[in-house]
């Protein structure tokens, strides 16, 4: 064990780590010994692990020199000053028994135990560096009658073993205001309790809370204290004024390691990055029984790992392949050959330690690749891999939050941790930022890179791999291409810059940005502003403020459904919820919880919000400006400054950084409201969340009332907005037809289009000035003409003569087949781009059942009916392309795990298994078509009809035309339902009734006809 040992109680169950063993289980495919041979060889090996590179043998050890890498010795530094950039930091503990090589001036901070902040980054010269920071105290506040009794209680907790660790602590009186609830007086009998050990601080705080003490800020972790209390950046540049190198007994695996006191650090505002090293990696496995590999199954081994090493900027592209068995050379690739899986995995982790990338990416590596490697080393080989991180006693691990276990393979969000490494998995990034039918790497590469993967079926991988060195090279190229594609995706989306900006803004680590929710990012911001105002945050017990939590959500006005062939103006409230919170001073710090605190104030100083039987009151800014309001104001002002700076910026990289910064500010602003409404959050407050939505409803209703009462005459538009009589084409009619949370749809009849477009922004400004407090602002967004308003949150509209806007309609659903989508799209296009159909649709929507029977449908509607007839012909005459009839569902878990077995995509998988064809993996989207039933039974279930599209094409199986046409009728009816007249007949039946009748004979009748 190193003379400097660090312990993180959140990551380690105990301080005794597993020891590396001299012997190990050796598992390898028989085919790498005898070409083409199936099965595995399993035995125990006593020889030293080794690898082969370019026909030379290398023994594997942590301190080995990696053959393909050139390591340059670090230079000597001036001990009086150093400049460095950090991308990550972790909290660790040091104990008395570990101080032998620690400089004397830092020893008292860790006797008997103490916190050490480890910061990872690059020096100004590009050297990888670890900075050990001493002197950061961890503390909380506690209400108690006197300090002596509190000290005795804490001493007793340490002595009785509830904490199982001791450290120095200090108790001192504190004079602070509570953030929660308006009050003019500081908290009575308040003490600040400071500890040298962050773990002890948190444990003591929780125990005191459970014993009934009122405590504050026990949930604030020591890294947040470090960044907030000192005004430090969690991602950025620092000067260290004075430091001492750690030459002996290092705690890190980096060549440069220094020690300093927290007061020696100075944070700098430079936003530029140094060059950071990155990896993109991918693994290939062999499932022993042909099933999807399970890391805990002994025989489901890793056979290859590809790594592409690159930098955050520049063109460096170094490719590495770790493989079992010998492998033919691949151009431009370093190939490392291993005799067993354990040696391959060990070689990979040694390479991780030696090359030591700061960022690691891949595609679904959190849920699969990294998780698989960790489980293999832990469960199969019982080998501790934390030493391969940036810390010698570090951690490489995974965790799945309890609530995520119930989710499927791709839906579960696994948290991964490696000391000093940031994981940026491109799968969750791209699946959250773009819309696609599925999120397989091949699909995303086609959409975003216009590149297609070279396919190698899962059946071919084992055959190729055991066939010999040339076959393993084929598998290696296939493995490498995934890593290469991910590098291109990584550089295209630049998510790492976005993460860094959020981290800087929120005073949290980049790891927190990636793996934690919004409240973890907002909480430190609130803490920062509260600290500036001498306020402290109460620690909520689990039941406090959560009983019966829930409130009426955002208002959606009942839409006046219909087909509108006249212009509809859409207005949006700019940053609605943040604006409401700022305008009305809504905050924890302004909420009135005790009426005695406002006894000396007049009612004009108080905002009262009534919600049914409940009333919430807040003091106005003249009494106290809210903490949340101040934060929001600052962020929005910064965003305006950043966007202005972007306009004048010519440097592409700086412009990218500025864009990520303004996006981080926008996201953070929009998250504040959610923090107050999170029932199980750090600072829930139903009074704030409910008041925001209540005031939002009032704004929506007041806008509707104003439009319906004040904006109904030509005189209004002439006097207020400068129109003249020539701007009107008939009797003016203005009405609000829909309101959805922060949007208002206003239909305007008989006003010239050019005039309406000119005054639309003026209308928004007029309503804003008349009705709302600053900074609430109604903005003109767009004009839709025509508009099909189907129901709440579902509409289709045409913008700017050519662009169709879809919201919540079947046309864009992932589960609809392309054929159905195409028919719906054609009919929607007729309604929006064919004037004859538009005129007919308006007439059709106002017809009665009697008029329909006597007059028939308007002429323009026949174009819609003809398109439906064409689709019917294609389906019933088997002329539709099977590839356009494919439906799909995601296989979210193993087939056996489904409680409902009668699902279409599961039926397809069973058919494939029966025919011994390739079985999809968990996470894949399963494509299928519905085939004609053999019995002619119309009531056959979909799962009985579902078949693999390739099998249908190969065997020319007829499809179930009636099922598909039924889907078309339903989808078309849903999309254009507002144009149907109001009759007693169901709309789907009416549409079928309007179509000309036609009988389609199947092959049986054709055969009879031939005989006759």
Swiss-Prot record:
Tell me the PANTHER family matching this sequence. DNA POLYMERASE CATALYTIC SUBUNIT, DNA POLYMERASE DELTA CATALYTIC SUBUNIT
Known EC number: 2.7.7.7
Mind telling me which GO cellular component terms the entry cites? host cell nucleus
Q: Reaction catalysed?
A: DNA(n) + a 2'-deoxyribonucleoside 5'-triphosphate = DNA(n+1) + diphosphate
Q: What does this protein do?
A: Replicates viral genomic DNA.
Q: Which UniProt keywords apply?
A: DNA replication, DNA-binding, DNA-directed DNA polymerase, Host nucleus, Nucleotidyltransferase, Transferase, Viral DNA replication
> What phylogenetic lineage does the species belong to?
Viruses, Duplodnaviria, Heunggongvirae, Peploviricota, Herviviricetes
Tell me where it mainly resides.
host cell
The GO annotation for biological process reads:
DNA-templated DNA replication; viral DNA genome replication
By its UniProt entry, which SUPFAM superfamilies does this protein fall under? Answer: DNA/RNA polymerases, Ribonuclease H-like
Cite the GO molecular-function annotations of the record.
DNA binding; DNA-directed DNA polymerase activity; nucleotide binding
Nucleotidyltransferase in keyword set: yes
Q: Where in the cell is it found?
A: Host nucleus
- Name of the protein this chain belongs to: DNA polymerase catalytic subunit
Q: What family does the Swiss-Prot or TrEMBL record give for this protein?
A: Belongs to the DNA polymerase type-B family.
- Look at the named UniProt entry and state the broad enzyme category this protein falls under: transferase
InterPro entries documented for this protein = DNA-dir_DNA_pol_B (IPR006172), DNA-dir_DNA_pol_B_CS (IPR017964), DNA-dir_DNA_pol_B_exonuc (IPR006133), DNA-dir_DNA_pol_B_multi_dom (IPR006134), DNA/RNA_pol_sf (IPR043502), DNA_pol_B_thumb (IPR042087), DNA_pol_palm_dom_sf (IPR023211), DNA_pol_type-B (IPR050240)
